[in-house]
Amino acid sequence: MIKGSCLCRAIRFEAGHVTFFGHCHCSMCRKAHGAAFATLAGVPAEEFRFITGADQVKLYESSPGNHRAFCSVCGSNAPAKSSDSKMFYIPAGLFDDDPGARPTVHMFVGSKAPWWEIKDDLRQFAEYPAE
């Protein structure tokens, strides 16, 4: 299991294998993370559990049906369940351990920051990656 935590460690979690790993350039992720993009790892919901701090996770509905999670103590982004409840999406900076996976895609490059240039060879998608 991969362990992770927020900045203050009030929220601690463990996760199973990463099935999605990518950089999201949508304007909401850029605003929420205060960066050019958010690097997110997806794990199946049944392979995720909070060790401590589930009660410290607060949600903000950034768009209908989509919630962003954050720690009510330190304000760090926190793992959030997908709108269909099948996955947990974890901001990759929260991992304490090497997740054993690496990003494979850039998504929402159609709305990326104009001041950021993508210089790697990862696949790029204007919106969500094709499945």
Q: What feature does the model see in each segment?
A:
Residues 1-131:
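A short Gly-Trp-Pro
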